[in-house]
Structures are given as structure tokens and as C-alpha cells.
Design a protein with these regions (language model features):
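Generic domain-boundary/flexible-linker signal
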Residues: 19, 39-41, 121
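N-terminal beta1-alpha1 ligand-phosphate binding loop
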Residues: 3-26
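Cofactor-binding loop segments of dinucleotide-utilizing enzymes, especially the Rossmann-like FAD-
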Residues: 13, 33, 115
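Anionic-ligand binding patches
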Residues: 2-9, 44-194
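Surface-exposed, flexible loop/turn segments at secondary-structure boundaries
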Residues: 16, 36-38, 118
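A short beta-strand-loop structural module common to alpha/beta enzyme folds
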Residues: 28-39
Length: 194
């Protein structure tokens, strides 16, 4: 299945999402949304991820009529606590100390706003982080890699050393579940060509 020349827009400033989307669509436009990503503590993490993804896509939709706009937001959860991107190095250290030696959930809310229909869905994967020493945590933070990642690590980069195992979609853990995205695009009548 390959896309035709229909307009596809990614509402994200994440280089990882751009990289992932290029694996299935060689051509698309990137138009980041600059909405404030605010969590509603009264909602489940899955609903927060969906709502933020939808807000990202819908915020730019008026600028792209007759297009399919993709929004996504990734959260990490453990024991009912939600971890987004760390605010600073101290916060990254706190997050990694909480995750180390434990299994957590990575939830990506994905939304597709099509010309006729909007669909969103949360996708969940599980990741088990091995026990980490204080030095391993500090050395990893010193690389700068954790600073723009939900959960303060990147499974596909240097942070892979700390991952003992995972289940579910790896592209979901990175930030954009590709198989599930294709299903949402089909449901919004994205015109794939054979």
C-alpha cells in the first residue's frame, strides 16, 4: 500500500515522529501545533493523551482544508503517576529513579482529522527498565538525550541500554504507532493507492 498525492500533515515538532512517518509516507507536510499541553488530573492517562493529540491536530486543521492531519501525544505512566518530558535535569533524574527496576506503560494518543471524519485512539505499550545505578542515570542525563522525551529516555537511542524488555508497538514507545495510524487513516477514508 502506498499513498497517493493526497495531502497529509503531521502536527508535531518531534523529529522522532517525522522520522517514523517517513517510513510509511515519503511525502507529507509538517506543521507543528503550539498548543499548551495541559493534563487534566481528573482524566485517565489514555484520555489525556487522546485529548492532547486531538487538540494538536484540530488546532491546525483550519489551515489545511481537505487534508488529513495527524496529531500525537505520548505519556509514560507508573502507579497512576503521569510522566511527560522532564522540566530539567533534576526532574529527569527523578523520573528515571521512579522508572528504574519497574515496568511502566507508554501511552500515545493518536488523532487523525480528515475532511469528513475525525478519529482518535490511545495505544498502550509496556516497558520494563532494568535497575540502574546513580552513575548510569547521571551519565545518561549528561548526554542530553532525556530532556525532550516523555519518561526521560529514548528506547531507540542511547537509552536502549536501560530497557530490559517491552511489549506492544515499539513505534508507539518512540512516539507514533505506525500500524495503528494506518488503520485510523483508513477509517477516515485516506485515499491509499494500491
Amino acid at each position: 500500500m502506498s499513498p497517493n498525492n493526497s495531502k497529509l500533515v503531521l502536527s508535531s515538532k518531534s523529529p522522532r515522529r517525522v522520522e517514523l512517518l517517513k517510513k510509511i509516507f515519503p511525502q507529507f507536510e509538517v506543521a507543528p501545533s503550539y498548543i499548551e499541553e495541559v493534563l487534566d488530573i481528573g482524566l485517565r492517562p489514555e484520555d489525556n493523551a487522546r485529548n492532547i493529540a486531538r487538540a494538536k491536530a484540530e488546532s491546525i486543521a483550519p489551515d489545511f482544508p481537505d487534508c488529513w492531519i495527524i496529531g500525537a501525544d505520548t505519556l509514560v505512566t507508573l502507579d497512576n503517576e503521569i510522566f511527560q518530558k522532564p522540566e530539567d535535569e533534576k526532574d529527569a533524574e527523578r523520573i528515571l529513579n521512579r522508572l528504574q527496576g519497574r515496568e511502566h506503560h507508554v501511552i500515545t494518543g493518536v488523532c487523525v482529522v480528515g475532511p469528513e471524519k475525525t478519529i482518535d485512539k490511545p495505544i498502550t505499550s509496556k516497558v520494563k527498565i532494568k535497575p540502574l545505578t546513580e552513575k548510569e542515570i547521571k551519565d545518561y542525563i549528561a548526554t542530553g538525550e532525556p530532556m525532550d522525551k516523555a519518561g526521560a529516555y529514548a528506547i531507540q537511542q542511547k537509552g536502549s541500554f536501560m530497557v530490559r524488555s517491552f511489549s506492544g508497538s515499539k513505534t508507539n514507545i518512540i512516539g507514533l504507532p505506525l500500524d495503528e495510524l494506518k488503520i485510523l487513516l483508513k477509517k477516515t477514508r485516506y485515499p491509499f493507492s494500491a
